[in-house]
Each structure stands twice: as C-alpha cells, then as structure tokens.
Amino acid sequence: MDKNTPSGISELITRLRHDRTLTDPEFAALIEYKDELPALTAAADEVRRSVYGDAVFLRGLIEFTNICKNDCYYCGIRCGNKKVERYRLSCEDILSCCDTGYALGYRTFVLQGGEDPYFSTDRLCRILDRIRSKYPDCMITLSVGERSKADYKAFFDAGAGRYLLRHETATDAHYAKLHQESMSLANRKSCLFALKEIGSQVGAGFMVGSPYQTTENLVADLRFLMELDPDMIGIGPFIHHADTPFAAFPDGTLFTTLRLLSILRLCFPHVLLPATTALGTIHPSGRELGLKAGANVVMPNLSPVKTRKLYALYDNKICMGDEAAECRACLERRVASAGYKIVTDVGNVRRT
C-alpha cells in the first residue's frame, strides 16, 4: 500500500481510529498529506461524540502574573523582554475574577502565570485554599511552570486538582533551540511524571509550527504523549511576538494544527482537548474549526480587562477588551454555531 495515496491515507485513518496508534512513518505521512482530509475530521468528531457527546467544557482563565524568571525565545513575557509592563494580581483580585466566573456558570478556574518567584508555594496554597473554601463545587487548575514534586503535592492538597504544563517539544535538540540553556526537556518531563504520581489530572501539549520544528519532532510529541497518557492536551499554532528572538519566524498554520487535533482525538478518545485562543487568533473561525476537528474545551478569559493586554505571549491575541460576560456569550454562540453545546459542570476526563 502506498500511504501517500488517497486510499492509503484512508486506510491509515481507519487503522488509527481502531488501534489508536500508527508507525512513525505512517504518522508522518498523515501529518504531511497536502489535501484536506474530511474523513479524518469526521472520524475525530465521531470519536469525541462517542465519549463526550456534544458537550464543550468551559475553563475560566485567570492570568494572574506576567512576571517570569525564564527567557523562552518564543514567549512575549520572557524575562529578557524589557518592553513589557509587568503586573501581579492580588488574592482579592483573583477571587473577584472567580466571583464573576461563578456567576456566569464557570465551574473550573485556570490560574495561569509566568514562573514568578513572588508566588511562593505558601502564597499560592493560601490562594488555592481561599478559592476552594468559597467554591467547593469548582475545580481549580494551576499552570505556573516547573516546580518541585513537593510543591506540586502542596498545590494538589490545597485544591489544585489539575495542572497544565506544556512540554512544548519532546525532542531534546529542538527543546534546546527554543529555551535558555538552564532549562531542559528532561526536567520538564520529570515534572509531568511527578504530577501524575501525586494523583493530579495532568495536561501537557506543544506548539505547532514552532521555529526549527520538523515532522519528526511532531511524531516524537505524539509518542511522548502516549507514554505520559495525560488527561488534557493543549496544542496551538506558534504565533510570533515582535519583541522576541523569533519575531521573524513564520507562524504555525491552521491546517496543520487542525490535522493534529484530529490525530490526537483518535489517539486519545478520552482526552480533554482545548480549542485554543491561538487558533482563534490565526483564523476568525479557528476555535469552531478546532471543535469540529475533535476539541471539546474552550477557555474564555476571566482576567481583568486592564491586565489582559499585558499577558501577551504572542502578537494579535484576541479577546483582549471583552468583559467576561461578553466573552461567555460570544463563545456560547460560536460553540452552538459549530454544532455543540456548552456545559457548566467541572468537566472531568472520562476514561473508559
């Protein structure tokens, strides 16, 4: 069988749906196939509906600090970017965001920030405990980068039942091209496995179309995710930021991101898979197309409008000026237009 013909590709899709894996060359052929693959999109949608129906889960995003000690070459809030106006939200600010979100039906809050030394383990745990005490029916997700296993356990015990930490790329040489020398893929992976060991729901993920990325790198990402078996996988296109070393690199494409969303859904039928803001940034209907390709989570922004423009990981980020209620109503319309419906429960992973 020639895997690069329409019939060969069709067979790969059928086999991937059944076996949840392919060989490395077969994955590469599927990723690189130049034509649209409606059969792949349809298979991914059928699989997501078989597990989650037409439900799309809301995650209220609270970007609580744009201060970061790291200097990742792709990121707009890297410590080396001296043009950024830095901010931190207080515990009361964060609780106010949660109040707004709860009234709008959000039952998961995602606290995301740079690796800001001010937010010590104790300080973060106090914030988590306040949220958990006020909203015991909600799930808290934390995303604050690489910490020790003891820190992760403390966060988990304080109420953060989920943790997001994108691995960004599963290839050492590629990782080294994207990050400062003091950072390592080995440590990033070790953090992810530590999170699993303590019982946290874990999210990993990667950029699509990042500088120097090859198809082989993407296949390695799929293999690593199979090893990790996360509860959530966040992928989105690389989008350049003007004040980074990667300002002149081309952005990742909608085409390849959607292709990978569908592949991920077939590999991981149970996974929680966001249609990211970055998708909506590179295409006006990016998030709707992401849902149709297999995604089942959206993450509207609950951060104060005055700080949103300061949390610019990449250029032209959407939804910078909308009040939380506007974001909620807009997303509800978008989700419905794609043929799904927003649900307001905590949206736990459904493993079979």
Predicted regions and their residues:
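Canonical Radical SAM [4Fe-4S] cluster-binding loop centered on the CxxxCxxC motif
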Residues: Y52-D93
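Conserved, mostly hydrophobic/aromatic
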Residues: A44, C72, L111, L165, ...
